[in-house]
Amino acid sequence: LKKVKLESFWANHQYKYEFNPPHNHSAVYSFVIWLKIPYNYKTEILDKRFSGTKVIDRKPGCFEFYTPNSDTLGNFGIDSYTYQLDKSWEGTMLFFPSNLTHQVFPFYSTDEKRITLSGNINFELFLNDTDKK
């Protein structure tokens, strides 16, 4: 029998230019709930700081998972999946394996804060009734 344990949780309040660098967590699963997203991705990518870059390389305000990879010839690369966030994501929970590397990019178009609730979940394994104590 397994018991689900909310190991930790916290609120993130991020303002313009703030970000979370690439990281992962030590639990089994993690989650993020977007409570407030004060910007629109389509507005963010038009910011003048991105002139001269490909639209696909512009990631302001985004949440991204990535993992290194290599092919049979030893060529190294990175696979990624990017969530282009806007107000429509408010109230959405994303649940993922904690060891999956992820990052949060800064936003630029507003002085309002982005608010998320994040946490880590573990399992406790009970082999018999005496282990529950």
Language-model features, listed with the residues they occupy:
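Catalytic core of non-heme Fe(II) oxygenases with the double-stranded beta-helix
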Residues: 10-95, 105, 112, 127
